[in-house]
Amino acid sequence: MSVLSRAVQLAFVALGLCLFFSNLVAAQPIAGPSLGVSVKSVNGVCRASKPCELEVTVRNTNTKKPATVLNWNTPLDPYADQLGVFEVRDSKGAVVPLDFIQIRRITPPPASDLVEIKAASSVKVKVALETLSRAELPAGTKYTITATGWWQAVWDQPKEQVVQSHLQELSGAFSGNFNSNSVQVTKVCSSSSPQQ
């Protein structure tokens, strides 16, 4: 996938999100809940037979209020790797073209797609980078991974309140971008011995 086709894909995703969230009553930049994203390499070696793993932490820095997050297209989404939430760059800083999927979601979102993060707390998930591991890329090459994207809907309320009062119309939500730190991984052939 070329950079141009990736840009076109992202433009369509952005347009779809704008149309979908145009009914938000309070479409505000993220100012209420303060969320931070960090990534850490669990095993920094990617093989086709065993994908490298990241541990992703989403932290609510608000010390007084919980944050309830719609997990769509975020690091908390079970499809995050396949949706392109994790940007991969080569040693020269160029974005590595990988194959991603697009998902049509049923709206309103089910309550199971909401994640509550208590005040001054965090949630952690492990993500296997299967798209990078399956890609036909040169062995022995180092790549930099960053989680980057857009919080579509974040509420500074408990999940139960969001489900009762806001989920149907996605009202009262904040939105905004996220960018994590970067971690480095190495792509190797499946037959190579593990690197520590």
Swiss-Prot record:
Residues 1-27 form the signal peptide. It is found in: Secreted. Its main location: secreted. One of its GO terms (cellular component) is extracellular region. Keywords: Secreted, Signal. This is Uncharacterized secreted protein ARB_00926. It comes from Arthroderma benhamiae (strain ATCC MYA-4681 / CBS 112371) (Trichophyton mentagrophytes).
